[in-house]
């Protein structure tokens, strides 16, 4: 069936519609509103986004915070040029971390970030990841100090389709105004559209709940299996506080800010008796595994053949998704992380 064929999720996007910078002020970004009941499309801007939110809906937000996850170092302690890139993925245990390192590397190699800080490659893993340990001289760094190292020397991990180096503006624009718990290597991009003013109005006027899904590097990986049902999606760390769990259990009408919030809610609501706050979320939503518990979604425009495009199709159907994306391209909407948004009602 074509809805399970990977090629059905391909589309052509002119390069000039890939947003390399955010729209400022945030409220001026464009917003496409699709109402499934009336089958209508409205073109507006984010300054009006809350006008479209159903009054009785619970609004769910992901408050993860993006780490400065890209580090540049040298394989030799006294070389001034830092040409070896280390992409920090997540903590493993103690002072070790799972990373991706560009270029040739072997176990035992060291990467120097300055005269004190370095990382040692402990193991080359089968999935392209590298297990490394961080040191200050010969002293192992704990997780708190590794985060300080990333903050001091790291760069914001802009997505690979943004063809420029990170700049000072990215430190705050590639971060939601309600980001709280550090651990993501990519931003939950629908959240980037909210200014402090819009957020305060949302929190005042709507029921809301926060959760934390640390967006992992796997979010940039495309689906590669010809039959999308055979794809194994990446696992991400999810935390839902007890207070938010109680609100979610009672809510019948849910609006998610972004696909990460939606995947988190769908994962949680399918658990029989959740008795903890921390989870490993690996839910892949598509037309054969449809959305059951979320009613509305605010999201950006996603890459061809991506799991996120399949999620949108699971909500509104493949043909309607293609139709709306075609309209968005014709109307010159900006795509991907720094792009415009879409509200599905």
Curated annotation (Swiss-Prot):
One GO CC term on file: cytoplasm
Q: Its GO biological process terms?
A: queuosine biosynthetic process; tRNA wobble guanine modification
Question: Which pathway does this polypeptide act in?
Answer: tRNA modification; tRNA-queuosine biosynthesis
The record's listing under Gene3D superfamilies reads: QueA-like
Q: Which key words are in the record?
A: Cytoplasm, Queuosine biosynthesis, S-adenosyl-L-methionine, Transferase
Pfam families, A to Z: Queuosine_synth
**Where does it mainly reside?**
cytoplasm
Q: Which GO terms describe its molecular function?
A: S-adenosylmethionine:tRNA ribosyltransferase-isomerase activity
Compartments, as annotated in UniProt: Cytoplasm
Q: If you read the UniProt record, what top EC class would you report for this enzyme, in one word?
A: transferase
Q: Does the entry feature the keyword Lyase, yes or no?
A: no
**What does it catalyze?**
7-aminomethyl-7-carbaguanosine(34) in tRNA + S-adenosyl-L-methionine = epoxyqueuosine(34) in tRNA + adenine + L-methionine + 2 H(+)
Q: How does it assemble?
A: Monomer.
**Name under which the protein is recorded:** S-adenosylmethionine:tRNA ribosyltransferase-isomerase
